[in-house]
Amino acid sequence: MNRKESKSMKTNLLYIFADQWRYQALGVTGQDQVITPAMDSFAGEGQVFTNAYSTFPLCTPHRGCLMTGKYPLSIGLWTNCKTGLEEKIMLKPQETCIGNVLKDNGYRTAYIGKWHLDAPEQNFQEDPLSGARDWDAYTPPGERRQGFDYWLSYGACDNHLDPHYWMDGPEQIRPGRWSPEFETDKAIEYMETHGGGEDPFALFLSYNPPHLPYELVPDRYYD
């Protein structure tokens, strides 16, 4: 099999995950106070895993496990990337992640949304050029992006109605929109742009909601 034939057998990959979304936050699982019609419909068309568990249901450790396939404690991610610790918690650049593997196998790689695997910039400087505050961080192009080429992301910030992002420079992008809607539109734009190329794409779409504060949703969802 030559390289061209091998490429033609690879499908595009879209991996969507949301922060803190668990069994109790889905209407399809019979939770009376939860209304998730889109997810319920999606579940009806796909496969629902009712016995799947995170090895470490905390933001940074879980994400590190997802990216590397390793237990979080084995890669030093015993808590979140945050300020106020003597140890600088972050996913080490030398770890081989799924983005690296996919890129090495001919995929165009993309990451959109919350990252929370890089050490907060205020651990190193009080007033970083990127404007990152508290647990947040701008991850510049290079090895700390773990194999992802297209990048529209941030470290950790929970203002869902007024999110910000970074791409390939320290200037913040502030769309003034609810983060899941903006990120979904950018993901669709990416897939429409790259879906017809010779090389397949692998896109990771990481929503922050339903991470608290829970009330930060557009008013129409209260109707």
Q: Positions of the model-derived regions?
A:
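Formylglycine-dependent sulfatase
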Residues: 1-223
